[in-house]
UniProtKB/Swiss-Prot annotation:
This is D-alanine--D-alanine ligase. Belongs to the D-alanine--D-alanine ligase family. Pathway: Cell wall biogenesis; peptidoglycan biosynthesis. It comes from the Bacteria. Its EC number is 6.3.2.4. It is an enzyme of class 6 (ligase). Disulfide bonds: none annotated. Coiled coil: none annotated.
Length: 364
């Protein structure tokens, strides 16, 4: 008997359009698997209203024709469309960035008591926050590039002091990032003090906390990880960027892989770097209490050859050019099998949590 799966995509997020592309890929795979009854839920970018669609269209323009049935949720009671209850066995969120990767939707699904694909509340919330993620990884002696972080209110009160810290502790050039955002949105490289204020202000347009890191010329390595208690680390891949300073939003989603961008799977690594990447991927996954899946990004300095953990993505891209599925496929796990495995992991994680915690014993 087929399981009822709810695929949630879109979202009130700067990465809304990327989510649509990822959802289309996953939906197509679910149809090929023919193991699940798929309920496609589109979350409007402006209103945040949830709509039940007949399918996941291949383009954003087609969605508007189908957004008629509004989805309502009542924790403890169920999910409803047109006053009819939907019996959902598992939820697959593919909302990138805010509300999707920050623990919000994970908390909601937990309240609904439904298995959920991917990381839980804690792992999601920490991983998406670049500042706290780096602080935590550094505390476990996992190498990260030198950085400082600050909130908007603190910057307003002590702008010159923070700019002085950037100059003294990091030295230029530096890379300026919104703390909670993905897909390289709002990220800029500042080469001198005259640029830093402009880029900090731009980053604050996306988030209330900004992270400034020492910019290094680096190789960009990505590593796919799946699993719960037992994890599998796939062969790392490398993104070789020719015409961009780093792998920014335009490079990721506005450029067709070719001369400007080359995906090398496997990445050309010496044995030490390969082993270190797999070790740090394992430790990062463990310390952040991740489950389901993650893409862990690394930097290898072209000057010093030193390795750093850069960022952690708990809902990596599933578009036709995304590295996560490509790395899995290189090691023999097809796109469809990957999607199916992630759903299985969601059921396993849910069952373990339910078996481990017996709330009835607290009753008097």
């Amino acid at each position: 008997m087929k399981k009822n799966l709810m695929l949630i995509f879109g979202g009130v997020s700067f990465e809304h359009e990327i989510s649509l592309r990822s959802a289309y890929g996953i939906y197509s795979s679910l149809l090929k698997l023919d193991k699940y009854n798929v309920f496609s839920i589109f979350v409007d970018k402006v209103t945040g209203i949830w709509y039940l669609l007949d399918s996941v269209p291949s383009s954003a323009e087609l969605i508007k024709r189908h957004t008629t049935s509004i989805v309502n949720f009542i924790p403890g009671c169920g999910i409803f469309v047109n006053n009819k209850s939907l019996e959902i066995d598992v939820i697959f969120p593919i909302i990138h960035g805010r509300t999707g990767e920050d623990g919000a939707i994970q908390g909601f699904v937990k309240m609904m008591d439904i298995p959920c694909v991917g990381a839980g509340i804690l792992g999601s919330a920490i991983s998406i926050n670049k500042y706290f993620c780096k602080v935590l990884l550094k505390s476990f002696n996992i190498p990260v590039v030198s950085f400082i972080g600050f909130k908007k209110d603190d910057y307003i009160l002590n702008k010159e002091g923070i700019k002085e810290d950037i100059n003294n502790k990091l030295n230029y050039p530096v890379i300026v990032k919104p703390s909670v955002l993905g897909s390289s949105i709002g990220i800029n490289v500042a080469y001198n003090v005259s640029q830093i204020e402009k880029y900090i202000e731009e980053a604050f347009e996306y988030d209330l906390t900004v992270v400034v890191e020492k910019f290094i010329k680096a190789r960009e390595i990505e590593c796919a990880v799946i699993g719960n208690d037992q994890i599998k680390i796939f062969t790392p891949g490398e993104i070789v960027v020719q015409d961009f300073i780093f792998y920014d939003y335009d490079a990721k989603y506005s450029t067709v892989p070719g001369d400007s961008i080359v995906f090398n799977i496997p990445a050309h690594l010496d044995m030490k770097h390969l082993l270190d990447i797999k070790e740090y991927a394992f430790l990062t996954y463990k310390y952040l209490e991740l489950r389901g899946m993650a893409r862990i990004d690394f930097l290898i300095s072209k000057d010093t050859n030193l390795l750093y953990v850069n960022e952690v993505n708990t809902i990596p891209g599933f578009t036709d050019i995304s590295m996560f599925a490509k790395m899995c496929e290189h090691d023999g796990l097809s796109y469809e099998s990957l999607v199916d495995k992630l759903i299985t992991l969601a059921f396993e994680s849910y069952k373990k949590r339910k078996d481990k915690i017996d709330f009835t014993r607290l009753e008097s």
